[in-house]
């Protein structure tokens, strides 16, 4: 009788352990879809959170992917984000304006940017900003192999430490907003959160700038709680508008979080 009871107990125990092993088994990263998505936004009406693009039913937060920051009715926050693919001579002015308004931000930098502007990147960190990963070669990420995605992230990360002495903050912005389930999963496996945006406009062409007033109107028309604006640091219009934008948002009761 005791033997039968022990055997039954052992069988149940093995089932429990086996179930845990199955649930904890890691799916190979290479098995995730490489279907390409380009991040975009639905129309943002009445200062409400816009809808983003992605796979149907995708719960992006489960994959550590975000386009709206943490906020509440009592805690109104804007999360300023700047993309730095190359330096056009405006970043010092941007940093000065942020400091004047006591505003913190995250700067997403490429390896080339780090290598060419280590002093500026150090300044970002020393002034309390986050510095995130914008990859090594600025590729469209969706179709890349697992190893290539890892290399794009890791080499930029290594350059950050080598050239500035600072560790890269664990946030990545995929170039051009291009992603797949594979690229997001690989970033997550490396300890990164993928950061998209909830406000963007045509600002990255240095030869065809939208103008200071256009930028200000965009923020006044489409601001919302938890907003993550995509701001290219190479833009003259953004640089000229930033002070007025920050003053407007503060007047509306927002603080600037990271």
Identify what each model region corresponds to.
Residues 2-22:
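Sec-dependent N-terminal signal peptides of Gram-positive bacterial secreted proteins and lipoproteins
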Residues 223-258:
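Catalytic grooves of carbohydrate-active enzymes
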Residues 76-78, 88-90, 99-213, 217-231:
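Metal-dependent polysaccharide deacetylase catalytic core of the NodB/CE4 family, i.e.
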Residues 93-95, 184-185, 242-243:
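Short amphipathic alpha-helical segments
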Residues 21, 116, 179, 237-241:
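Short phosphate-engaging motifs
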């Amino acid at each position: 009788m005791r033997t039968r009871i022990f055997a039954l107990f052992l069988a149940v125990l093995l089932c429990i352990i086996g179930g845990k092993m199955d649930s904890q088994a890691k799916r190979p990263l290479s098995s995730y879809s490489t279907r390409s998505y380009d991040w975009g936004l639905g129309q943002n009406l009445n200062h409400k959170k816009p809808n983003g693009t992605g796979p149907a039913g995708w719960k992006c937060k489960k994959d550590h992917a975000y386009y709206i920051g943490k906020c509440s009715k009592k805690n109104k926050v804007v999360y300023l984000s700047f993309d730095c693919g190359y330096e056009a001579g405006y970043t010092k002015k941007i940093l000065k304006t942020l400091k004047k308004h006591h505003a913190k931000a995250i700067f997403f930098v490429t390896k080339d940017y780090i290598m060419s502007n280590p002093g500026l990147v150090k300044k970002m960190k020393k002034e309390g900003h986050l510095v995130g990963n914008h990859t090594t070669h600025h590729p469209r990420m969706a179709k890349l192999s697992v190893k290539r995605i890892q290399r794009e992230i890791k080499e930029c990360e290594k350059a950050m430490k080598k050239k500035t002495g600072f560790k890269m903050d664990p946030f990545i912005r995929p170039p051009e907003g291009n992603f797949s389930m594979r690229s997001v999963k690989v970033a997550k496996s490396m300890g990164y959160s993928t950061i998209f945006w909830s406000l963007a406009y045509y600002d990255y062409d240095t030869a065809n700038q939208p103008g200071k007033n256009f930028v200000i109107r965009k923020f006044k028309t489409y601001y919302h709680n938890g907003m993550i604006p995509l701001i290219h640091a190479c833009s003259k219009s953004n640089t000229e508008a930033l002070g007025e934008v920050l003053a407007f948002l503060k007047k509306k009761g927002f603080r600037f979080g990271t």
